[in-house]
């Protein structure tokens, strides 16, 4: 396939996208609740995200709406297809299968009804990398990809050219396989992306983390501050490598009810 011109637009599921003019890093930061009391604003205010602070006033910085229900898979697939759950088909973590009479996890890519932005851009000649924390999400995001680098930090020790289009990731990153329930699982994603961008000319890089830290720590807590300080360092590295950066979240961490038991909508 011939790579399309940078002036061309690509149509995916009824929406038009510009061809990247520089390596474009899109980060879905799992559970990173926005707003004045959210994780990033709090980390900036407390001095743990100096790079992010420097970018806020000269970049687009807005609060957007997430897809409902506000689950990880639902929102990741909404981001990467540009559609809503009723169109892309991933409408929850599981559903009740009336034919089998039991709950069925929606991790299989057969439930995805439309093409991802990755698939369409790859077919147009784009060089793409998709790196996730968890393997189950990697399988959904990587549907129909044939050339793109696509792996999870959870399974970084078993990546291979046939399935992931990359090998020896632990050596590339110079880090051990991270524990699943740790901040390291997300940091490995960023570290791997930096090395891949240094090594290859990429067009689109999608990184999706885990919300382990957000479940463990409220905004401003030590674990959260350490995590966002780490993230800030990698954002700075992506910027130094000439990347366009887009940072969003799949959902927040607010409770479903208020202290009096009323719904917190």
Model-derived features: where do they sit?
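His/Asp/Glu-rich, glycine-adjacent segments
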Residues: 2-3, 82-218
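Active-site-proximal N-terminal segment of extracellular/periplasmic enzymes that hydrolyze or transfer
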Residues: 2-59
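Metal-dependent active-site segment of extracytoplasmic phospho-/sulfohydrolases and closely related
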Residues: 26, 51, 226-264
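Structural motif
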Residues: 26-28, 204-208, 246
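Catalytic metal-binding/acid-base residues of hydrolase active sites
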Residues: 32-33, 210, 217, 251-253
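Short, structured active-site-proximal loop/turn typified by the sulfatase FGly-forming signature C/S-X-P-X-R
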Residues: 35-82, 127-129
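Short acidic, glycine/proline-rich loop/turn micro-motifs
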Residues: 38, 216-221, 258
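Anion (oxyanion) recognition and catalysis
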Residues: 56, 122, 239-240
């Amino acid at each position: 396939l011939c790579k399309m011109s940078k002036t061309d637009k690509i149509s995916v599921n009824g929406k038009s996208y510009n061809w990247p003019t520089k390596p474009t890093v899109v980060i879905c930061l799992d559970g990173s609740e926005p707003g004045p009391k959210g994780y990033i604003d709090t980390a900036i205010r407390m001095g743990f995200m100096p790079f992010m602070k420097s970018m806020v006033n000269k970049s687009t910085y807005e609060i957007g709406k997430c897809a409902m229900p506000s689950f990880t898979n639902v929102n990741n697939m909404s981001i990467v297809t540009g559609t809503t759950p009723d169109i892309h088909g991933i409408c929850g973590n599981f559903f009740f299968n009336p034919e089998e009479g039991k709950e069925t996890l929606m991790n299989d890519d057969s439930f995805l009804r439309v093409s991802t932005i990755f698939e369409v851009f790859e077919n147009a000649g784009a060089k793409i990398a998709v790196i996730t924390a968890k393997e189950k999400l990697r399988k959904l995001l990587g549907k129909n990809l044939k050339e793109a680098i696509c792996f999870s930090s959870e399974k970084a020790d078993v990546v291979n050219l046939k399935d992931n289009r990359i090998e020896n990731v632990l050596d590339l990153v110079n880090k051990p396989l991270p524990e699943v329930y740790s901040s390291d699982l997300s940091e490995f994603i960023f570290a791997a992306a930096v090395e891949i961008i240094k090594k290859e000319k990429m067009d689109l890089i999608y990184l999706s983390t885990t919300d382990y830290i957000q479940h463990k720590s409220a905004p401003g807590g030590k674990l959260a501050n350490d995590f966002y300080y780490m993230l800030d360092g990698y954002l700075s590295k992506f910027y130094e490598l000439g990347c366009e950066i887009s940072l969003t979240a799949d959902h927040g961490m607010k409770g479903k009810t208020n202290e009096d038991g009323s719904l917190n909508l």
